[in-house]
């Protein structure tokens, strides 16, 4: 981390996490943070689901909830950015405080609860960037008090299909009561059927990804994989935050309710990723997320079966230069290992990760 990055982090860490997040969004809107411009290397290009990603590193959903700064994020060196989660109606989310830094663990616990400005606000911003280059996905969710949560996802597809490079169906946040129950096979089957029907009726038909939780057992993973294959979903994102608590060094704050992200999530999310790759086979796209904070952790996700990777929490601790550094590290790895494409690395550690228990 550079001196400027350290100073910026120290300044932001002087504020509570939610205020710091708002300041970082405002800074990106003004063009203030200077990231490390990502190298353009043909070996890092990934063609997936009809999209050409300039590199495999993306910004995960949860940072730019209301589609305020997707182009600024791409300017930091990300190969793609995912905005949201957006719900049909605006909602305030859960009571504050609801974000907690676990600095000793380079982790965060959040219980935000899909706080966002709603479909209309996000759609207006995304419509305004029409014609600009860059891959921007939209992560869609359901309102907490909705009487028809599946209908909320249908509305999300209908609203954003023409604006999104891809859509992510997020049913894995732990902070909306009952949402994760939609991962159960019967509910999931109905959800995916209706989502795919909504896409079929849209004028534009972007790829559909399903974002799953890391807190699943083998039988649940098998059910999800079966539904993904049967309903012809384009890909999955593994994984959301975890409600489990691996050994942490951050004391009482580590016992806060909510989803844990960052470095402690890497192991379990990568095991789930590999197990899903085994279940889905080689042809379905997988985006790996959870604990990515360096070129090596990003590369290991790919070795475990990911086509693309995402990060968020890592940038809280390493600053806006992180995506550029990771992409440069990936390019150096390709050069050192004489790879013609980063895709050659995929699945090279698949058996190692897939054989680990979900403990």
Swiss-Prot record:
* GO cellular component annotations of the record: cytoplasm; plasma membrane
Q: Cross-referenced InterPro entries, in alphabetical order?
A: Aldolase_TIM (IPR013785), DHO_dehydrogenase (IPR050074), Dihydroorotate_DH_2 (IPR005719), Dihydroorotate_DH_cat (IPR005720), Dihydroorotate_DH_CS (IPR001295)
Known cofactor(s): FMN
What positions does the entry give for FMN binding? 61-65, 85, 139, 170, 211, 239, 262, 291, 312-313
Q: What does the entry comment about cofactor binding?
A: Binds 1 FMN per subunit.
Keywords in alphabetical order? Cell membrane, Flavoprotein, FMN, Membrane, Oxidoreductase, Pyrimidine biosynthesis
What CDD domains is this protein classified in?
DHOD_2_like
Q: Where in the cell is it found?
A: Cell membrane
Membrane disposition: Peripheral membrane protein
The answer, when asked if Flavoprotein is one of the entry's keywords, is yes
Per the record, what are the reactions this protein catalyses?
(S)-dihydroorotate + a quinone = orotate + a quinol
Per its database record, what is this protein's job?
Catalyzes the conversion of dihydroorotate to orotate with quinone as electron acceptor.
Protein name stated in the entry: Dihydroorotate dehydrogenase (quinone)
Question: What organism does this protein naturally occur in?
Answer: Mesorhizobium japonicum (strain LMG 29417 / CECT 9101 / MAFF 303099)
Gene name in the database record:
pyrD
